[in-house]
């Protein structure tokens, strides 16, 4: 195996990406049991339940993410229902499109939705969040959208996922502590708000933390079939590690290219259909959730039993989103008969008081709707996530 300035070029990823951080956001396996046009689920259905809607891509190129969120919400509604407060869920497909997401939102309002755990993607979440302050006012907590634009100026919109700046800052601080002598290439999707947002905050914190970035390479969705040109430039610049806040599909391409070029090879990356998992050996990820962590065993086993797949971080974040709604409902003293506006106002106040001991950590929220929790670093070893 050839070397780069005496070392292999190693990727560091986040939850949805290759090298370093979170967007998880994750979720590549196709999850069973989801209808492409949505459907009712949960422990109860009908008028005698508190109705939780969810929105995400259930068809199209990003369907795996939406299906993970849908199933995380569904399982959460089952697990956090009580006799006094049963929860029901309904999913609608937005194909990761903002206009379709707003249409899906209105469909869920017609169904009687009292709170929204969604949408899944950032663009769709920004579009729907702008509607949540209208009449009826609607409480929204997105499992996986990470842009600050989602919650900015919204008093009833919250996030489960780290914001983009937090992901980039935390990743740079961690890498500066653990890998201060490495030379980094920053590799990201310049056409994606999630990827470029994390890259910007990572770069700023890297400068402050004296982390050396020797090269910066970008791509867009229509060119995500081969990254050999970018990797060649990174090698020539003397890079020894890659920081890549990108989604799983381009991450799998990147790792194949890294391996092909004689270098050493994300959360969710092991579930990409047809992906050679040996390529991810030694991969470093920063993520608040691992299906291999013993503390998550009950959730993982229940998810596998119901859907036949291992849950990823999208599913875990969605499950934690329902958990947060359930805790906030108790804190606010709300029941199944709460109207959306009443629920939005009281749940939003309750969110600032609760602490959720969730799958993705101990979660609290600030008055901007942003979550506070700690990421954990994992290394892929023998096809499993091992805490670094």
Which residues does each predicted region cover?
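N-terminal secretory signal peptides
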Residues: 1-13, 21-32
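Beta-alpha junction/loop-to-helix N-cap segments that form part of ligand/metal-binding clefts
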Residues: 40, 67-69, 79-151, 219-221
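Extracytoplasmic "Venus flytrap"
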Residues: 53-72, 76, 80, 92-99, ...
């Amino acid at each position: 195996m050839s070397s780069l300035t005496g070392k292999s070029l190693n990727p560091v990823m986040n939850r949805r990406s290759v090298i370093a951080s979170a967007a998880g956001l994750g979720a590549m396996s196709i999850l069973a049991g989801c209808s492409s046009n949505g459907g009712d689920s949960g422990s109860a259905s009908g008028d005698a339940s508190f109705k939780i809607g969810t929105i995400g891509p259930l068809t199209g190129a990003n369907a795996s993410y939406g299906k993970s969120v849908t199933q995380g919400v569904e399982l959460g509604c089952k697990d956090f229902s009580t006799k006094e407060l049963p929860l029901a869920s309904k999913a609608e497909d937005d194909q990761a499109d903002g206009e379709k997401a707003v249409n899906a939102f209105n469909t869920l309002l017609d169904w009687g939705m009292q709170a929204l755990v969604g949408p899944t993607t950032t663009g769709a979440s920004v579009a729907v969040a702008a509607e949540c302050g209208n009449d009826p006012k609607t409480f929204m907590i997105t499992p996986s959208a990470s842009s600050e634009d989602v919650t900015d100026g919204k008093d009833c919109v919250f996030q489960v996922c780290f914001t983009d700046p937090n992901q980039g800052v935390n990743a740079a601080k961690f890498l500066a502590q653990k890998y201060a002598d490495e030379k980094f290439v920053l590799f990201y999707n310049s056409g994606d708000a999630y990827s470029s947002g994390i890259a910007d905050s990572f770069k700023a914190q890297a400068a402050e933390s004296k982390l050396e970035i020797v090269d910066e390479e970008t791509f867009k969705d229509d060119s995500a079939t081969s990254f050999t040109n970018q990797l060649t430039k990174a090698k020539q610049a003397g890079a020894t590690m890659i920081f890549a806040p990108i989604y799983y599909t381009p991450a799998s391409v990147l790792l194949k290219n890294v391996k092909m070029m004689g270098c050493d090879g994300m959360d969710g990356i092991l579930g990409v259909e047809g992906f050679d998992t040996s390529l991810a050996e030694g991969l470093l990820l920063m993520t608040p959730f691992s299906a291999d962590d013993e503390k998550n065993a009950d959730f993982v086993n229940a998810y596998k039993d119901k859907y036949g797949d291992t849950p990823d971080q999208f599913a875990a974040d969605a499950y934690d989103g329902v958990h947060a709604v359930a805790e906030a409902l108790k804190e606010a003293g709300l029941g199944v008969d709460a109207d959306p506006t009443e629920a939005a106002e009281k749940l939003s106040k309750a969110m600032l008081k609760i602490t959720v001991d969730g799958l993705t950590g101990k979660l609290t929220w600030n008055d901007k709707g942003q979550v506070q929790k700690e990421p954990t670093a994992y290394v892929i070893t023998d096809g499993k996530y091992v805490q670094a």
